[in-house]
């Protein structure tokens, strides 16, 4: 549409790989899918078997115990639909020159100890913060739920074909 605007464009070294666009009524989150970018295209794969291996779960996040959600556990999905999962199970990363809150949670990084002392004296950082040379923290896995949609569509098609075969028998 003529009123569509691109707000963010994601690129790799060769191509645009995604965009965030809006028009007068909607937001689009786009991943490149043009046929000219693809090879080895196959329409023959068993989506139902893969989909049946997934284990949807009900859960809440530790940080929000009042909200129950339906979803997946990333490391369980990674062996079935690896293209949908980012990160590695139990991964951590080490940060340098870190300021921690009083409860030990991450606050800010790349602050020298001298700058931290100065900022505390100026009141920029709370007195109960702590500076550490290195701090290890979890690097959490994520799931791109949109990567599951083709499996859902293909499974519906496979089940429709099975139903038709049974009805025609």
Residues covered by each model-derived region:
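Trimeric beta-solenoid/beta-helix "fiber body" segments of extracellular/virion adhesins
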Residues: 1-35, 43-46, 64
């Amino acid at each position: 549409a003529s009123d569509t605007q691109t707000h963010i464009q994601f690129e790799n070294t060769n191509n645009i790989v995604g965009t965030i666009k809006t028009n007068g009524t909607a937001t689009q989150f786009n991943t490149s899918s043009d046929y000219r970018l693809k090879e080895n295209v196959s329409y023959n794969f068993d989506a139902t078997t893969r989909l049946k291996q997934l284990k949807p779960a009900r859960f809440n996040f530790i940080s929000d115990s009042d909200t129950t959600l339906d979803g997946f556990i990333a490391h369980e999905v990674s062996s079935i639909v690896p293209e949908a999962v980012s990160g590695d199970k139990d991964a951590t990363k080490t940060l340098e020159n870190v300021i921690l809150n009083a409860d030990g949670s991450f606050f800010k990084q790349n602050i020298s100890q001298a700058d931290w002392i100065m900022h505390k004296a100026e009141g920029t950082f709370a007195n109960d913060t702590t500076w550490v040379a290195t701090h290890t923290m979890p690097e959490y896995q994520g799931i791109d739920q949109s990567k599951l949609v083709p499996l859902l569509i293909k499974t519906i098609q496979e089940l429709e074909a099975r139903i038709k075969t049974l009805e025609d028998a």
